[in-house]
Regions:
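Mature catalytic domains of secreted/periplasmic carbohydrate-active enzymes
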Residues: 2-182
Length: 182
């Protein structure tokens, strides 16, 4: 019989949990290509072909984005932290990742690293930055299909956990080392 592992949080983990509870209001930003369709982040799970969906990146141009103004507005609203969706299940990276050209800098005419700008604004205005990163990827052929994302046109025979883990870990390393205190 398999034994159930017992989780024991570290002192640092318990402290982080308490700090989060004490933070009160935070802003969670879910934003990406799916926003252009007036849809939520699960839009691609509705039978949309991933290759067709990816073409929308060529029209993603958030001209009104101003990180300093956003963070200032969050602070005025009483927020103590902001959590930014760096990458959702559609696989589009909202930062200048070196691991894939499917990102805000390389795949859009906008060409700016939104996460860099948000990170800098948060540091200047003493706002804590948290990052959300989806482990699911409905566009990469090496990501094995789970319970969702079956109708995106990916070839499920190309699933390869080792290559996907390598990709994911490289992206997570970028996020946790290149964008200041997280």
């Amino acid at each position: 019989s398999a034994e159930t592992a017992v989780y024991t949080p570290t002192e640092a983990n318990l402290k982080a949990r308490q700090e989060f509870r004490d933070s009160g209001l935070g802003i969670f930003i879910h934003w990406g290509i799916y926003s252009m369709f007036g849809q939520n982040e699960w839009y691609l799970n509705r039978g949309v072909n991933a290759q067709e969906y990816a073409k929308a990146a060529s029209g993603f141009y958030p001209a009104g984005f101003n990180a300093d103004q956003w963070v200032e507005a969050f602070k005025k609203a009483g927020a103590r932290y902001v959590c930014f969706t760096t990458r959702h299940h559609d696989g589009f990276s909202m930062w200048n990742t070196s691991q894939s050209g499917y990102n805000i800098v390389d795949a859009t005419p906008f060409g700016r690293d939104i996460l860099r700008e948000l990170s800098d604004a948060c540091q200047k205005q003493d706002m804590r930055l948290h990052l959300y990163y989806s482990h699911l990827d409905w566009t990469r052929p090496d990501y094995p299909q789970g319970r969702t994302g079956h109708e995106t046109g990916r070839d499920s025979t190309l699933a390869n956990w080792p290559t996907y883990y390598k990709f994911m870990n490289a992206q997570l390393t970028e996020l946790l080392t290149d964008y200041g205190p997280i």
